[in-house]
Amino acid sequence: MKLGSSALSGLAVVLLGCAALQPVAAEEKAAVESAGPLLWQPSMNVFRRFAVEPEEMFKFYGDALGLEQLQTFDVGGGTNVARFRAGRSEVKFTRRVPDRTYVPGAVDEATGLRLLTFFYPDRDQVVERFVAAGYDAPVFEEVPGTDRLSALVYDPDGHAVEIVIAPNAPQELYDTIEVGLTVSDLDVSRAFYREFVGLEELPPQDDPRFDTQKYSFKHGTTIVTLRSFGADLPADTGTGGIQYVVTDVEAIDRLAKERGVTIDQPLSELRGFALRTIWLDDPDGITNYFAQTGASRRAAAAQ
């Protein structure tokens, strides 16, 4: 399977963006204080771009991590979008695109989307899957003050993945995905995710694995966690990003312009598909992509 770098269909655009998108004018509607009230899907999705053979990524995330592989979208032009279910979220994969920077490696080596965390009830099952898939067994450490275990591994493209074993936890935790962002300025980034995106801010926590504090924000079964290791790290703006499904993307466009948020790809419509989109950058250039689908639009109209 060969993956390309441009998207030509609805759900693929959620991941990639597309030059075929046509600008649309924003209608005058009531102002919103943040994107929070417009979030329709009770989770967020995440995407990662890669340079290795796609089968290597599929083996790691499917066979070893145990994520359910969903239909891969063939969007034409030799372009495909691979999708995996992680609880109520989707993790999506595509080839790298130009005009973005890529810095594989550890969580503290660059700003950007640096870590994905998945939660499991049973250590032995995880180890068995890794070994059966031909990988070394993850090395788990105790999480101080809890009954949990944690292991840090790297996917075939050099991206960090944390595996947390949490026995006897509520099912909601096993449906949760934690998206770890390394940022250059915690105060600025916290304000962005709290005040612009409108996520629920959780109390800060000590993070013994990375010897720092982490600041987390929650929406449904997705947690966005911020860490900082200084202001002088190189910026990885291409490896990954976050996608939100909203009821009114035009309101997001107006809010972004009002707040001075960087717009990477402007408010657009994919002709032939019930999809309107806008791509924004957070203060470190990490993609925050907002999509209004036919389903979310109909849900808003029915209210």
State where each predicted segment sits:
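Helix N-cap motif at beta-to-alpha junctions
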Residues: E53-P54, Y120-D124, D185-L186, V246-V249
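Bacterial N-terminal signal peptides that target proteins for export
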Residues: M1-L11
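Bacterial N-terminal signal peptides
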Residues: S9-A20
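Vicinal oxygen chelate
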Residues: A26-L39, V127-D175, G180-L181, P204, ...
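Short hydrophobic/aromatic beta-strand micro-patches
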Residues: R49, T117-F119, G180-T182, Q243-V245
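Core segments of cupin and vicinal oxygen chelate
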Residues: F47-V91, R148, G180-I223
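A short, acidic/glycine-rich surface segment
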Residues: A30-V32, D99-P104, L226-R227, R298-A299
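Ordered, small/hydrophobic-rich secondary-structure cores
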Residues: A35-F50, E56-V143
